[in-house]
């Protein structure tokens, strides 16, 4: 039941992901007294942000070599609304797009952005990262992370940024549903680790899959997102502890 409550609160389009937690619990953010270092002390609901042992994001360095199965993305055009929840820009996704992990179907609920990246790869921080958030009927969560490096403009980002909600709390219907598969690289090799949500309540037992190959976004696209946020919206990397990262 607790998993289902978290899934409903964090992934429902009407809940607006992070905004729901801000409304239902203590206000949190990325600067000052409500910055990531203090999240665990803002509310008892956020205690895991401070006490959790399997927190995300992480710096992906030492890894264990394994024969990870290919990720079977079954995505279709379903991104239909763009939301500015004050913490990120999020695109709500209609039902029907799935990713199978460990033999289980996870439905894509939404995707959102962080600048700079939250996860690091070999100590490198990218200027932008997108998180594709999935859930299953039992309330389990899986997040695919994809990095962007500065380069050519990304066509899908162009479409999204042209319709980006400017006011906090605003939601706009996209003129045409987008397919997040258009963001994915051809090389979909990845790292896998056990982690958490990177925002309060920092719920753990999240399957994390970080793609190795970055895509590109133009300097103007990166700056446009950063300007709208007004400040970095990334949680610092968390201790890896006893966890292993598999590739």
Where do the protein language model's features map onto the residues?
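Bacterial N-terminal signal peptides that target proteins for export
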Residues: 1-8
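Alpha-carbonic anhydrase
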Residues: 4, 20-247
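Bacterial N-terminal signal peptides
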Residues: 8-15
């Amino acid at each position: 039941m607790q998993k289902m409550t978290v899934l409903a609160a964090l992934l429902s389009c009407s809940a607006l992901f992070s905004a729901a937690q801000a409304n239902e619990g203590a206000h949190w953010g990325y600067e000052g007294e409500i910055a990531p270092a203090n999240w665990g002390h803002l509310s008892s609901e956020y205690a895991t942000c401070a006490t959790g042992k399997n927190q995300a994001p992480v710096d992906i360095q030492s890894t264990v070599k394994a024969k990870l199965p290919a990720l079977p993305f079954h995505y279709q055009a379903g991104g239909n609304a763009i939301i500015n929840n004050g913490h990120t820009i999020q695109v709500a996704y209609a039902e029907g797009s799935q990713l199978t992990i460990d033999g289980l179907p996870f439905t894509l609920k939404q995707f959102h952005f962080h600048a700079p990246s939250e996860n690091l790869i070999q100590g490198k921080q990218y200027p932008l990262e997108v998180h594709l958030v999935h859930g299953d009927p039992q309330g389990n969560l899986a997040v695919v992370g994809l990095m962007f490096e500065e380069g050519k403009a990304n066509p899908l980002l162009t479409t999204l940024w042209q319709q980006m909600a400017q006011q906090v709390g605003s939601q706009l219907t996209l003129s045409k549903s987008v397919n997040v598969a258009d963001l994915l690289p051809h090389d979909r090799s990845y790292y896998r680790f056990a982690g958490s949500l990177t925002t309060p309540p920092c719920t753990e037992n999240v399957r994390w899959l970080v793609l190795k190959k970055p895509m590109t976004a133009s300097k103007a696209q990166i700056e446009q997102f950063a300007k709208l946020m007004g400040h970095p919206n990334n949680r610092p990397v968390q201790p890896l502890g006893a966890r292993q990262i598999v590739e």
